Every structure is written in C-alpha cells, then in structure tokens.
Design a protein with these regions (language model features):
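Short, Lys/Arg-rich flexible segments
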Residues: 1-163
Length: 163
C-alpha cells in the first residue's frame, strides 16, 4: 500500500508541525472553563445537561431555588486542565446524592439526639428518617456544550492551519 501526494506539501507539513507545537493545556483549559460556566448556568436555570427541569420539592417552599440554600455546592464546582484532559467537578461528599438521587437513605442525627426539620408549617423531630431525594443532575455535557467544544477546537485548528 502506498500514498502519493501531488503538489506542494509544504503547507501540510507546516500545519502538522503547528499541531505538534500546539498548547494542549491552553486548549483544554478553555474547554474546562466553558464547561464550568455552563454547569453554573444550570444551577440558575434549575435544569439538567439535557435541559430537563429539576424535580420540585415535595415539602417546604417551592419558590426557593433548589440546591442553593447556602451556595456551597454551586461554589464548589471547579475546572481543571492539563495537556491531556479537561475536567469539571466537585469534591463535596453529598454532590453525588444530588447528581444521581437516592432512594430509602437512612439519615441519623450526628451532633444532637434528634433531627429537627420543618414539613409545611410544622416542626418535626426524629432520631432518624428515611429520605428519597430525586436526581437533580448538574454535571454533564449538553448539546450546547458539545457545540462550544467544537467551536474551541475549530479555532485552534484554524490557528494551526494559518500558522
């Protein structure tokens, strides 16, 4: 098998050299920052990467934004990149509970004898409760994110071609 290239291949060689010298850390950093921004926007819109609205609360004030009581989860979203990978995520232990939801999870009081919480207008105390928390995914890559990644890559490819 053989490949034959006719014509002036200097531009092709130059483009390939430009790719070889490309700053992949910068490319991945650009992608990671874009993904972090869209993740934070999902908190504002209260929706998943698939643009599905998060399930409302069964109890309490439905006018309050979900996953926004203190802002800790939202503020823990970080982006990181190196020459091989772009990542967006959080290190909070409870993030997976909100991302994937839980069924029949037992919660016990840690720092006191009883848990205290409000259901409607009534305060309730219990040693432990079983909770079901619906999934409210905030991490992921949406169709819009894919387009943004494509645009970032297109920019760097054009830059390599133009030299």
């Amino acid at each position: 098998m053989s490949v034959r290239l006719d014509g002036d291949i200097r531009k092709l060689v130059k483009t390939l050299k430009n790719f070889e010298n490309a700053n992949f850390t910068a490319i991945n950093k650009n992608i990671a920052q874009s993904l972090r921004t869209s993740t934070l926007d999902r908190f504002k819109r209260q929706e998943s990467p698939e643009n599905k609205k998060w399930e409302k609360r069964k109890y309490g004030n439905n006018r309050k934004k979900l996953l926004k009581n203190t802002g800790t989860l939202r503020n823990s979203i970080k982006s990181k990149a190196d020459k091989k990978i772009a990542t967006v995520g959080t290190n909070l232990e409870y993030a997976s509970t909100h991302q994937f939801g839980v069924k029949n999870r037992r919660i016990k009081a840690k720092n006191s004898k009883l848990l205290k919480f409000k259901i409607g207008n009534r305060w309730v105390s219990a040693k432990e409760v079983i909770v079901n928390i619906p999934a409210r995914p905030f991490l992921g890559i949406s169709e819009e994110d894919k387009e943004e990644i494509k645009d970032v890559l297109d920019f760097y490819v054009k830059k390599a071609i133009e030299g």
